[in-house]
Structure formats: C-alpha cells, structure tokens
Amino acid sequence: MDIKLVNIGFGNIVAANRIVAIVSPESAPIKRIIQEAREKGILIDATYGRRTRAVIIADSAHVILSAVQPETVANRLSSKDVNEES
C-alpha cells in the first residue's frame, strides 16, 4: 500500500488520500465546522500560532487548520498526482 503525503506547512504532513476538502476559513459555515470540531476534540491545529488560511477536512471527519493558502495545498496535492503518472 502506497501512501501519498502532502506538506501542509511547517513540516506538517497529511495523507493525501484522506483529504475530502480544502477550504478557506472565512465563511460562517466553515467557522461553525471548526468550532464544532474543537468541541468534539477532532480539530488538529497545524498553524504554529499563525493565522489560519486553509481548513482541510479529512474523511475521518477530522478538521485540520493550516497556515498555508488553500491554493498552495491544492497545488502540492496535484503535483503529487503528476509525479505519480511519470
């Protein structure tokens, strides 16, 4: 079994096959998702105290906060797919 990993900033890595969505944290529904995850204990804060710029939702319902832009995470994810095909 080959696990693909994606760097989400500051040396933090997430399994690419577990990512369901990468979204911006500005909207009210996403803020609610973050708060509910915090209350349930399924929030992973990988921002190192910096501003949250991307919210990654995993298939296990875990919510991961990243200080890297959503576009950057998506580009890293898609570049992994390109490297696999070569």
From Swiss-Prot:
Domain of life according to the entry: Bacteria
InterPro entries (alphabetical): RemA-like
Family stated for the protein in its record: Belongs to the RemA family.
HAMAP family to which the protein is assigned, alphabetical: RemA
UniProt protein name: Putative regulatory protein Swol_1238
Organism: Syntrophomonas wolfei subsp. wolfei (strain DSM 2245B / Goettingen)
